[in-house]
Amino acid sequence: MSEDTRLMCGLTLILVPTIVYGGLTILGVLTSGSFGAPAPTGLSPLQVSLYRAGHAHAGVLAILSLFLQVAIDYAQIPTSLLWPARLSALAAALLVSGGFFAIAHAPALRPILYTGVGLLVAVTLLVGIGLLRSR
């Protein structure tokens, strides 16, 4: 494992407690506080769905970010794109999940979600093509 991969994987894993906290928040939302988690009041069904989507994407994209960090070591990617790829993998996880939470309360923040999706598409294509090109 390269030093850059170790650094980015470490940063990603440090963010996992925020996903755990989000899970506790979702538990409170879905159970109306009956499992000891605080129950927010006044959420619409759409907001609850966006909370669920944000939390689900956070976990899945954190795992994908970890995978991409390792895959970048094996992909044939131009040196000038290595760090942008590493940062985009982690940023996409943060922006997509954060975008769902943001638009639950402020629909005008929708570009956060779309920026994350754009980064996710770009980095997965870059790494995928780089892996196919490597020998």
Short names for language-model regions:
Residues 1-55, 59-135:
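Polytopic transmembrane helical bundles with strong interfacial aromatic enrichment
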